[in-house]
Amino acid sequence: MASSSSSPRNWRYNVFTSFHGPDVRIKFLSHLRQQFVYNGITMFDDNGIERSQIIAPALKKAIGESRVAIVLLSKNYASSSWCLDELLEILKCKEYIGQIVMTVFYEVDPSHVRKQTGDFGIAFKETCAHKTEEERSKWSQALTYVGNIAGEDFIHWKDEAKMIEKIARDVSTKINVTPCRDFDDMVGLERHLKEMVSLLDLDKEGVKMVGISGPAGIGKSTIAKALHSRHSSTFQHNCFVDNLWENYKICTGEHGVKLRLHEQFVSKILKQNGLELTHLSVIKDRLQDKKVLIILDDVESLAQLETLADMTWFGPGSRVIVTTENKEILQQHGIGDIYQVGYPSESEALTIFCLSAFKQASPPDGFMDLADEVVRICDKLPLALCVLGSSLLRKSQTDWEDELPRLRNCLDGIESVLKVGFESLNEKDQALFLYITVFFNYECADHVTLMLAKSNLNVRLGLKNLANRYLIHIDHDQKKRVVVHRLLRVMAIQVCTKQKPWKSQILVDAEKIAYVLEEATGNRSIKGVSFDTAEIDELMISPKAFEKMCNLLFLKVYDAGWHTGKRKLDIPEDIKFPRTIRLFHWDAYSGKRLPSSFFAENLVEVNMQDSELQKLWEGTQCLANLKKIDLSRSSCLTELPDLSNATNLEDLYVGSCTALVELPSSIGNLHKLAHIMMYSCESLEVIPSLINLTSLTFLNMNKCSRLRRFPDIPTSIEDVQVTGTTLEELPASLTHCSGLQTIKISGSVNLKIFYTELPVSVSHINISNSGIEWITEDCIKGLHNLHDLCLSGCKRLVSLPELPRSLKILQADDCDSLESLNGHLNTPNAELYFANCFKLDAEARRAIIQQSFVSGWALLPGLEVPPEFGHRARGNSLIIPYSASNRFKVCVVMSLNHHQPFELVPRNLLYRWTVIGDSVSSDEKTFHLSHMFNADSVNSKLQKPHLFIFHSCLPFIFHSCLPFIFDISNIMLEFSSEYKDFDILECGVQILTDETDERNIWGSLVF
């Protein structure tokens, strides 16, 4: 529902007062009126209106023509139905025309107003004695609402005159401030302001400092300016200090400089030019009795804060807001309340961009994909979205398509802003940032620390410094991945590219690298090479290409264009690699093995995906530092080397190594090995016992079609995936794997009966598209932690066993033979998906629908809404009477459009609530349906009409506010497909009251 408060209005009166005459008219109200006259405030005078049982039209008109409504709540206020009707009209105007409502509690406890208790409550009950329940309810809700509006409480004031002066000042502030429109188009701004106002705690008397921190270009200054615009009028003095970086460069101990800055600062706050201060302590004398709002924008050093923001200088109620890219500065200055500005959502980012590029909130026809691509390039950074949007304004689609390649690697208009944080770093932290950006983006913090252990950098401290300056983000999950924003990566690449050749530690320019490798012109200063071969044709590498790079730590050769089938680099067999290398990443390596001169004693990670390797190396290597081997999609690989010395190996990835026949027995004693990925190893027949791998948590053997036997596995295993194999059973030893959480055996066509007892720790089971015919009772119902069970496409499954109460998701779509449920569904929190299960018997259907009333959603075949839904209609809309309950069960019959592609599933269901009464208001919500269908399902299309049942609540504004402001008679619900991929044939609603009603509703359900 949209309020018209954003539209300018011509207000006839400044103030309307609602009061009970005998309580306040003679003394308090007369004094208040005199003060308003003194302050030039126009107040509506109701002396000429005769009071009656019904609020007069003239009074309604006056309320609607007043900018501010003051509700004077006294102990007998509720004894007047006139006053209570006035209150309803005031709240109506607040909601619909943006009227400002203020409260004064005159000799009455605010809690008595809210709860209608005490003498106030007695008066209210007497007034309600002969009224309808509807009238009583509206008045009660209105009093509760207005009682929660913070206002002046008479009991807290010793001097009534000062209280009245304060009220007059507050009214003056509210009516004299013209709303600033500068920030109306700032997407998501209100959310930021709400968080900041909460931190500022503007009602408290003490002095408070609050920080706003975040990366460059995120909108910190915009938020600060909006706060200044909105709240500066409530302070005696205010000051917005920007350009601190340029104008307030401060060095500790420069007394004269600090004194001059104090003079400028105080002059700006007090709006008095040419002020002279004799010493530094004078600033406190000038400001300590003044309530000030000070915003220090873009602070970049602790010295600036110490010089310009001491909390002891300012008067009670003062607030200081500090914006910075360095969170550590705020912490060092003792600022505990810090608002960290996050990136906008995907939809918000698109809106921000569109407002700059198209001057509208969404892309015009034909521009959606282009707009999405630019938003991706900007990685949701607001400054970049605005700058790039403006640069594309009023350009054609062809111009956009021509511009996109350049935009992917340019920083037009934002480079200087992004570089500030980087240039403020010391030399070692700059180097750390470049290493992370080029080689270790999205890697775990511990892995970054390990890889850079021999780089002479203080990595742990450096990571903290980079995170405090928002140059990196460290995820807060267990892995603690280090992430660099896309535009900062572009900046880092530009920095590396512009370095002098003899000083370059990191090579990233493809043409320069090609020359160095062909002519062997490297040098000892080079520590990292990141070579994107997408930018070159073919290259003959010199055998001595790396000979002079004696300090090389990181070598990364890859193809960002994913041209993995094209071998571009001719690698000589006798090439020599430095033994200092810690990262050896070479995609599509064309040699059959690494040269015999290769030494791996310093190697931490080897990553050679899509290679032509037949074997990694010959003989035995010293592998004490090796943590990871990734040879995925190396289709010629026939064997792995002896890994018995790789005692610290944690990750082994050989997925899609289709010629690999067996894994070496040497891996059986690698006690730190945690992850083994060997999916689609089509020739793999033998896996040695893994029982001694006490750290193993993840095992993927998907599509190892020749695998005859499930290997022995350790009790440490957490995730087992063996899809698309010929296995006929799971090992009984799984029972003892007390940490097992996920088991995926989809596509196991030879698996007929699922009877293996699993540990109670299991939370995810996927048996989809298997040959399963029967699931024994005991192997599922005792899994008290089971969250989701996927049986999609199990076409031979006839019956479901009893399921545990813990289940949240049951996917049984495309189970062609499924007829019955063994016992009642006792899954109070489960989403139930039975798409295309056309053989379900009546009892099973009844159980599914009944359970859906308790749990979340249900999808099952059906041609019509069950008659027990109290309100039903053909087509996509229906009208139901308004109810005090705000809980509903909704059923729609949907049918997939026949003209859509066969593999398409329903996507988004839109449904709109519209309340109908003496005013009409609407609200729309979206259900995302596509996730209900298993991606591995053989046939996910709805073959016939289906029932979709879901729980919904009336939007809060309709349920909590409108009923006591307007008379609501009916509610209309409309359903539609956002992408026109399905039709709504029927719809139905059941209003829910309490659990007893729900049981009664479905106790007699018949099909």
From Swiss-Prot:
TIR domain ranges (all copies): 11-175
Localization (cell): Cytoplasm
Catalytic activity from the UniProt record: NAD(+) + H2O = ADP-D-ribose + nicotinamide + H(+)
InterPro entries registered for this protein in UniProt: Apaf_helical, Disease_R_plants, Leu-rich_rpt_3, LRR_dom_sf, NB-ARC, P-loop_NTPase, TIR_dom, Toll_tir_struct_dom_sf
LRR repeat residue numbers: 533-556, 578-600, 601-623, 624-647, 649-670, 671-693, 694-714, 715-737, 759-782, 783-809
Disruption phenotype: No visible phenotype under normal growth conditions, but mutant plants are susceptible to white rust fungal pathogen Albugo candida subsp. B. Increased resistance on UV-induced growth inhibition.
Span of domain NB-ARC: 190-443
Gene induction: By UV treatment.
Key words, A-Z: ATP-binding, Cytoplasm, Hydrolase, Leucine-rich repeat, NAD, Nucleotide-binding, Plant defense, Repeat, Stress response
Any single GO BP term: defense response
Domain statement: The TIR domain mediates NAD(+) hydrolase (NADase) activity. Self-association of TIR domains is required for NADase activity.
Further information: The gain-of-function mutants adr2 (T-DNA tagging) are dwarf, develop HR-like lesions on leaves, express constitutively defense and antioxidant-related genes, and have increased resistance to biotrophic pathogens.
Designated name of the protein: Disease resistance protein ADR2
Source organism (scientific name): Arabidopsis thaliana (Mouse-ear cress)
Gene for this chain: ADR2
